[in-house]
Amino acid sequence: MPLTSLVGQFEGVVYTQPEKLVERHGWLEAWKCKAWMEDDPSQVVTLLLAYRSPLCRDTKPMYRPVAEEILKADQVDVLARGFRHDDNMMHGRGEFLVARLRPHSFVESPMCPSLDEIREVVGSTVETALTGNGEMAAP
């Protein structure tokens, strides 16, 4: 699963089985899962990984499930975002987004790494969640 390789890097994190939101080969793939720290299961966030062609704009109907997840969150922390060359995506490029979606009431557990640390780890390993053919990689 695409998110397990990203989330599994953090000690003490518990997460649900990732759920595929969208699968449109060459255009868009997106996954989400719930996650929390084992010392505080009441503080749940949603983690989102979206990978899309630059031709798949925010307003496209196929992007709606991703947009709805983002819009229903009280706060959005972008953990990683970027582009990569990918011949299997429309227009030969893929854009990835990894985000933490959380409620206003969210309070980080003392076990939780800082947001900067999370961004550093996810940003340096998001490529491993994507294979060379533009599909989400298995763990």
Swiss-Prot record:
Domain of life assignment: Viruses
Record Pfam families: GP70
Name of the protein described by the UniProt record: Gene 70 protein
Origin species: Mycobacterium phage D29
